[in-house]
Amino acid sequence: MNTLQRLEATIAARRNADPDSSYVARLNAKGLPKMAEKVGEEATETVIAALTGSDEELVGEGADLIFHLLVLLQARGVSLDQVLAELDRREGLSGLDEKAKRGD
């Protein structure tokens, strides 16, 4: 089990814990809108760190972004394996071709 898989398992284990003792449980209690807001907030902080911060700040914000994304995915019933399978599917495809297929 790698770090992301362990983190996903930890998030699952804490999802229904007491919101007073678990940040994951607190996020779940607040619902999808709050989780989505946190992903957006962490994405913005990651971009800012990439443009103006140190490598250490970027690493920290990247970790926060991944954590909050995993919380959101799990709340929607989407597993890390599903996301990794999609990345596997896209491997070797031109990014421009992939975007064209999606109509982006």
Curated annotation (Swiss-Prot):
Which principal EC class is assigned to this enzyme? hydrolase
List the EC numbers from the record.
3.6.1.31
Q: In which pathway does it act?
A: Amino-acid biosynthesis; L-histidine biosynthesis; L-histidine from 5-phospho-alpha-D-ribose 1-diphosphate: step 2/9
Q: Where in the cell does this protein reside?
A: Cytoplasm
> Cross-referenced InterPro entries, in alphabetical order?
HisE, PRib-ATP_PPHydrolase-like
- Xref: Gene3D superfamilies: MazG-like
List GO BP terms, alphabetically: L-histidine biosynthetic process
Keyword Metal-binding set for record: no
Sorted alphabetically, the Gene Ontology cellular component annotations on this record are: cytoplasm
Which reaction equation describes what this protein catalyses? 1-(5-phospho-beta-D-ribosyl)-ATP + H2O = 1-(5-phospho-beta-D-ribosyl)-5'-AMP + diphosphate + H(+)
GO MF term list: ATP binding; phosphoribosyl-ATP diphosphatase activity
Classification via NCBIfam families: histidine_hisI, PRK00400.1-3, PRK00400.1-5
The Swiss-Prot or TrEMBL record describes its family as follows: Belongs to the PRA-PH family.
For this entry, the protein name equals: Phosphoribosyl-ATP pyrophosphatase
Please report the organism this UniProt entry assigns to the protein. Erythrobacter litoralis (strain HTCC2594)
